[in-house]
Amino acid sequence: MICHPNAKINLGLNVTERRPDGYHNLETVFYPIPLCDTLQFSTDAGTDSHRPEGIFPNGIPVQEHSTEDYTFRSGGIDIDCPPEQNLLIKGLRLIREHYALPHLYISLHKQIPSGAGLGG
């Protein structure tokens, strides 16, 4: 499965009532812009994303981190955290608490800068 999560600009934000868990509900309007990451999940190491050409343009350095549960490859904009703190890996761990999943091969070509207010 390949997806292209778009960057987005927040056009409006309204903080509403406080919830019992201490967080607040939000009303917001997002506008997608034509900048996106490329994300691929597979159960097969032979898929295009895990070949040298993969989802990564030629010449882009690719980092790889593997455990018994997943192989995570990333290239493009540097992800400034250990793989275990990456939201993709945290989400995968939460899903694995409820579902038996095979070893997953995850590739991320990061193009949306983190912390830039673009949803990256």
Predicted regions and their residues:
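DPxDG-like acidic metal-binding loop motif
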Residues: 118-120
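ATP-binding N-lobe of GHMP and related small-molecule kinases
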Residues: 1-115
